[in-house]
Amino acid sequence: MVMSTINITHRDFPELQPAFGLWSLYRPDEAPYRFPGGKIEALVRWQSDTRQALAQAIGFQDLPACAFSPELIETIDKGDYVREKWLICTWDGARMPFYLLLPKDLPRPLPVVLALHGHGYGVKDIVGLWEDGRERDQPFGYHKDFGVELCRRGFAVAAPEIACFGERVSDFSHLNAFIGQLIPDTCDHTARLAFHLGGSVIGLRVLDGRRLIDFLQARSDLNLARLGAMGISGGGMHTMFSACMDERIRACVISGHYATYRGSIFAMAHCACMFVPGLSRFGEIYDLIGLIAPRPILIEAGTRDPIFPLDAVQHSLAVTRAKVYAAFGAAEQIEADIFEGEHEIHGARAYDFLIDKLT
């Protein structure tokens, strides 16, 4: 007779699941930095205190500044606009390429939008380029060349290569896959290193974005008093945290990201670059958005987005409007474009929204 052990499963004992007990500790309504409501004066104090605490949480906001040492890599005439490619130093340990799209025949200084791409092959995918650098004339993929479209709507568009993508991936050529040394994904590897150092990838990305704004302020042809931001997916997260941390961003479009942490980020697989250690101290995503209020926000969400589910989006929107923006007397400043579609840029309201708010 063959003997065997008695197997037990999570169907018998839910407590076998490591996350089961952790969820009992997830109490956003008790978080020390949750949105408090109350009078405007108290909310402004909360924003100041919480912004400082968030800077510590995401990390790297006090990395040593350096000279930008800008290099203009190329200038391409696209007919109705010019595309410049630049390389700047954002801190002592980082260089960042970015594209600057400048519409022709419009009065200067121009309003500016930061265009922040999501996962994929990088910034080229939003400025009309294939991964190998070849030009394309028609939008492709979930980004839909939204940087080009913003430019054609009259904005100067600053589109950075976000850390961990495109020309900013890590070199692991020293590893030997043949003997079993696994080649890590750049996002995952950078996130783990950032966590080890007490920060996060989003902290690095926010710092890069803020330094890019600093650099652009020196240009007389750009009006940084009319600065917006637009991003999708990981770029939507980048947009949200950048606007939370930098009040120079006067309006933003968050596409394919604004759901709830419980209903999206922790409900399924997401990239390690989407996580911040200790973020639970700030409540839910609609508490964090209080750092942007009452500045205008548009949320884009596809009804069939599999990784930012619609019910979580709608719940977050309802709380944001009724609890957060209403507290500032600005419920009308939070808009939504819920469209029939998946995880993708829509644009039906987004471009006009930024025109309305920034021009």
Question: What is each stretch, according to the model?
Answer:
Residues 292, 299-301:
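Short beta-strand/loop motif that positions the catalytic acidic residue
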Residues 1-82, 90-91:
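N-terminal targeting or regulatory segments adjacent to alpha/beta-hydrolase or S9 domains
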Residues 324-359:
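C-terminal catalytic histidine-bearing segment of alpha/beta-hydrolase fold enzymes
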Residues 93-96, 104-112, 119-122:
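Proline/glycine-enriched tight loop/beta-turn segments at coil->beta junctions
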Residues 221-233:
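Alpha/beta-hydrolase fold nucleophile elbow
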Residues 236-247:
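Short glycine-enriched nucleophile-adjacent loop
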Residues 188-189, 193-199, 206, 211-212, ...:
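Mobile cap/lid helix-loop segments that gate and shape the active-site cleft of serine hydrolases
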Residues 108, 116-210, 217-218, 263-268:
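Cap/lid segment of the alpha/beta-hydrolase catalytic domain
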